[in-house]
A protein has these predicted regions:
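Bacterial N-terminal signal peptides that target proteins for export
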Residues: 1-7
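C-terminal motif of bacterial Sec signal peptides marking the signal peptidase cleavage site
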Residues: 16-18
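Bacterial lipoprotein signal-peptidase II cleavage site
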Residues: 20-27
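Aromatic (Trp/Tyr) and acidic
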Residues: 22, 55-130, 152, 156-215, ...
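Low-complexity, Pro/Ser/Thr- and charge-rich linker/hinge segments at domain boundaries
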Residues: 45-50, 133-167
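Acidic, glycine-anchored loop motifs typical of Ca2+
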Residues: 236-240
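Carboxylate/His-rich catalytic cores and anion/metal-binding grooves
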Residues: 242-263
Length: 521
């Protein structure tokens, strides 16, 4: 089975004709308590961070892919050598290209192409003056393990169950937050909101954040289903359902607990307080936040999307999810306000998902009213992107002119990203001041969607170049991906790891699913 292309045949013909330039208990049982020293010495030695002059993807390169190293320094040599790390033999000698002085970074930069090296192995690069690079691999399955590890991060973050070493390894832990929580606005009411994924080290769980992350994971599966298997190494593996859907279903089960069964209202989230003193007069440390319109719309978006994709595996469960999404939508309508501009994006995305899954005209009416607005679409908003992709991919009746408007926005954004990447030192928009990768990941989300529609080789190359950037071919010479590379992001900041960021990891999964699919074509 090949990837499920978004079918907009008439639209693509129109567009492509003109785009020749587009190349718990109160005290949880089983929790681990960590104690530190009573006093921490104030040691603040300034240790300079050393960055190599030869920058590579520290994980490695696919056998037949383009392989480029970036060189930087006060002076540039003429040639470089690729060394077999095991034997010490020189296996390739190349010449530096496109030497130039970078005024912004105050350094010389150059590039070395060693794409003809296709023998599997572990290597590093040496060059006079600049020294050596970190080591890297060449092989056909270089990205397989980080793809699985990125997906497994959500399993590691499961709340309410025991994670055994068989599946979680060093991330194993006892069941946590298994008791009931108190409703923050009325502490006489207790609720079972166990389960789901921890979103940070405190164990917080926010419905809108969860819905957005779930939707990106589901989009990955929708666009590239063949990239996902049923043997990822979680307890549900082997049940006939792709593990990515099993994992999202675990979060869906928690989301359903967050909905009031009588009214359809959706509580905004679960807050874990570090001390009882945070809320005067209250004794528990787990609280359910009050229901909100944003949470209800986000809930409706995620569960409708899940329902649509899960119906082929369990139609009854999918139908129940769709009904829950509809109830949340209707409850939100009762409490929305005219000044709720920020929440309109959630309403749009929820309506798009509900229209595709259920086909009701009321959903379509709102989606098309939103798309017809004069102010246009916010091309930098992830939730709006999710709604747009669903509208142009639905089998329900749509307006061609609105699909054209969406595609024009997507393709314009894709070309802007491409232009920036072409002129970037590291073939991305990354630079010396890069303190997080959220914008780059969002850019790749846009590019991945557009590439799925038109299959542009340049876009595929740019997506892979961003993966090279995240894996060490960047100005800091660090890998932002856990368990990949010699020089981890932890050397400059423990919060920068992509897999350790709840929402960022889902976008990494989307990138890797596209790359895995492109390698099969």
């Amino acid at each position: 089975m090949r990837k499920q292309k978004i079918m907009i045949v008439p639209l693509c013909v129109i567009l492509l004709a003109g785009c020749g330039q587009i190349p718990s208990e109160n005290i949880q049982s089983g929790e681990n308590n960590f104690n530190s020293m009573e006093e921490t010495p104030d040691l603040s030695y300034e240790v300079p961070v050393s960055t190599p002059g030869i920058l590579v993807n520290q994980l490695g390169y696919m056998t037949e892919s383009t392989k480029i190293a970036v060189f930087k320094g006060e002076e540039m040599p003429e040639e470089f050598h690729v060394i077999d790390a095991e034997s010490g033999d020189t296996v390739y000698t190349g010449f530096l290209e496109d030497k130039g002085y970078n005024q912004e970074l105050s350094e010389y930069n150059s590039y070395g192409d060693f794409s003809s090296l296709q023998t599997p192995g572990i290597y590093y690069i040496e060059a006079p003056v600049l020294g050596r690079s970190y080591s890297f691999s060449v092989g056909d399955q270089v990205y397989d393990e980080i793809f699985s590890e990125a997906c497994r991060q959500y399993y590691y973050n499961r709340c309410g169950i025991t994670l055994t070493t068989e599946y979680a390894g060093e991330n194993a832990h006892n069941a946590c937050h298994t008791g009931k929580a108190l409703l923050k606005e009325d502490t006489s009411i207790s609720l079972d909101v166990s389960g789901g994924w921890h979103q940070d080290e405190k164990g917080q769980k926010n419905v809108a954040v969860a819905a957005q992350t779930m939707s990106v994971m589901l989009l990955s599966y929708e666009l590239y289903p063949d990239s996902f298997t049923d043997d990822m190494g979680i307890p549900e593996s082997g049940n006939g359902v792709p593990d990515i859907l099993d994992e999202v279903k675990y979060e869906v089960e928690w989301m359903l607990k967050m909905q009031d069964q009588k009214t359809g209202a959706v509580y905004a989230g679960v807050t874990i307080y570090s001390s009882n003193g945070d809320i005067p007069g209250k004794t528990a440390d787990i609280y359910v936040e009050p229901a909100s319109v944003e949470a209800e719309r986000a809930f409706a978006m995620a569960l409708a999307k899940f329902s649509y994709l899960y119906q082929n595996f369990d139609n009854e469960y999918a139908t129940n999810c769709l009904k829950a999404a509809d109830r949340a939508w209707k409850h939100a309508l009762l409490y929305e306000t005219d000044k709720d501009d920020k929440g309109e994006k959630w309403k749009f995305a929820a309506a798009a998902e509900l229209y595709r899954a259920a086909g009701q005209g009321s959903y379509r009416k709102y989606v098309e009213e939103y798309l017809n607005r004069e102010e246009g679409l916010d091309e930098q908003d992830e939730v709006i992107l999710l709604g747009c992709v669903t509208y142009i991919s639905t089998k329900q009746t749509v307006k061609l002119e609105l699909c054209e408007k969406i595609m024009e926005m997507l393709m314009t954004r894709a070309e802007e990203i491409s232009d920036t990447a072409r002129s970037g030192i590291y073939f991305t928009a990354g630079n010396k001041e890069q303190n997080n990768n959220n914008q780059l990941l969002l850019d790749m989300m846009y590019l991945t969607v557009v590439n799925h529609v038109i299959t542009n080789h340049e876009y595929e190359t740019i997506i892979e170049n961003h993966l090279h950037y995240f894996l060490g071919r960047n100005d800091k010479g660090v890998s932002y991906v856990d368990k990949a590379g010699e020089n981890s992001y932890e050397s400059i900041g423990s919060s920068l790891g992509i897999m350790k960021q709840f929402d960022a990891d889902s976008k990494l999964i989307l990138m890797l699913s596209e790359i895995a699919d492109s390698l099969e074509r």
